[in-house]
């Protein structure tokens, strides 16, 4: 390689490094045990899923380099409010309760809630059948909020939807209300063959997901909404 080509190659390399170094870090909080939206790929050791792909693309278009920080669902909003993260991306339903504490970007996914019950329990056919039942939920989820309004229901919360599914399968509880896409995805996986679970047909409540940001952070919201 002659000197001119060497200098040109070096200049190009510096431009690439400079571009990467110039990108702002976007601290992204996510509950990374919620497939298909966010989970750890056992082969690559990297976080993957619909939300991960989406925030990666959105962040880079906005001039950010996303940094995924794994945490529990119930810890996302406190982390936002304390400034530990910049944005929460975790199949977060836009609800009045959450909107009182944080702001949301434009909705990016239409979702909804559905019931999971055991195959050997045909008594649960709809939300009315959940009254006075012993139920389980993921802590901090919109499903847990929905169930808290069911007459006579007793609810035990778990750190993840997976733990709640296991409790339901082991007959520790009678049903769970959870995000419909997650319920459906779970039932398509090989691991579900070891579970005696079924999804009750129908959507209990339509929901929208959004990225959560700190109250008043209009600049960040505008960049992410572009």
Regions found by a protein language model. Give the residues of each.
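Extracytoplasmic small-molecule ligand-binding "clamshell" domains
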Residues: 24-91, 100
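Periplasmic-binding protein-like
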Residues: 32, 110-117, 180, 184, ...
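Ligand-binding cleft/hinge of the Venus flytrap
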Residues: 38-42, 55-63, 127, 140-161, ...
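Short helix-initiation/N-cap motifs at beta->coil->alpha
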Residues: 52, 67-78, 122-123, 141, ...
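Extended ligand-binding regions for polar small-molecule ligands
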Residues: 52-61, 121, 128-129, 134, ...
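Short helices/loops that flank or line small-molecule/ion binding pockets
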Residues: 60-61, 70, 74-87, 101-103, ...
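A conserved helix-loop-strand patch within extracytoplasmic ligand-binding domains
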Residues: 64, 92-94, 106-155
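A ligand-binding cleft/hinge motif common to bilobed small-molecule-binding domains
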Residues: 75-78, 90-100, 146-149, 174-205
């Amino acid at each position: 390689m002659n000197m001119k080509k060497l200098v040109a190659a070096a200049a190009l390399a510096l431009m690439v490094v400079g571009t990467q170094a110039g990108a702002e870090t976007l601290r992204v909080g996510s509950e990374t045990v919620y497939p298909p939206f966010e989970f750890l790929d056992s082969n690559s050791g990297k976080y993957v899923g619909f939300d991960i792909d989406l925030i990666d693309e959105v962040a880079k278009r906005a001039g950010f380099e996303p940094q995924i920080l794994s945490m529990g669902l119930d810890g996302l909003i406190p982390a936002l409010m304390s400034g530990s993260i910049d944005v929460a991306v975790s199949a977060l339903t836009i609800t009045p309760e959450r909107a009182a504490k944080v702001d949301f970007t434009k909705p990016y996914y239409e979702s909804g809630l559905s019931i999971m019950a055991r195959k050997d329990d045909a008594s649960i056919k709809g939300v009315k059948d959940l009254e006075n039942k012993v139920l389980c939920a993921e802590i901090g989820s919109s499903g847990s909020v929905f169930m808290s309004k069911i007459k006579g229901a007793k609810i035990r919360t778990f750190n993840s939807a997976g733990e709640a599914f296991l409790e339901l399968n082991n007959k520790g509880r009678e049903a769970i209300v959870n995000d419909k896409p997650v319920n459906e995805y779970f039932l398509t996986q090989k691991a579900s063959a070891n579970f005696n679970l079924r999804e009750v047909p129908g959507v209990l409540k339509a929901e929208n997901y959004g990225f959560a940001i700190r109250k008043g952070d209009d600049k960040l919201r505008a960049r992410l909404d572009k």
